[in-house]
């Protein structure tokens, strides 16, 4: 009788354990599956950053920004353009490399050239994506132009932006993504041999 009771008790324990395992497994499978699915559905893939490679600089191009070869057909003379105004004129984003000038020297050089004639104003410094730029502005018949100066190796680069405030979103997107090579002299020499028309523009 005692053995029979123990046998029944053992059977009950085994049955209870089996049910518990099935219950836990079902719950974990259901909950885990649901959680995984919801995470998978809720998490969208971040868009891959696409930079257009102009050889001596790379930059992410907003859809509204275009490319101009009006200053020259090769990549070392490339200019970026903002949307045209009602007169068909487009403001520009123009990078310029100064091999022999530091950032401070280039800034001082432009301040001297523009001077009182164009109401030059020193704008201090700003930072975009960890890079520091010295700023200056001047005014002419086309509006207010902003110049931003930064260090490269060798020398410095300044970017001229026409009517910055009118194109702030696009201009800051460009400044936040622009990058320069370690050897500007080598990159610019290579860019002089590449036509702008052969470069893949990525938006």
What is each model feature region?
Residues 44-50, 74-79, 127-137:
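Short, hydrophobic/aromatic-rich segments at coil-to-beta transitions
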Residues 34-75, 200-203:
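N-terminal "mature-domain start" segment
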Residues 63-65, 156, 160-203:
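Surface-exposed amphipathic alpha-helical segments
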Residues 25-28:
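Bacterial signal peptide processing site
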Residues 1-12:
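Bacterial N-terminal signal peptides that target proteins for export
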Residues 54-106, 141:
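Secretory pathway targeting signatures of secreted, lumenal, and periplasmic proteins
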Residues 19-23:
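C-terminal motif of bacterial Sec signal peptides marking the signal peptidase cleavage site
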Residues 111-155, 196-202:
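Signature of long, low-cysteine stretches enriched in small and polar/charged residues
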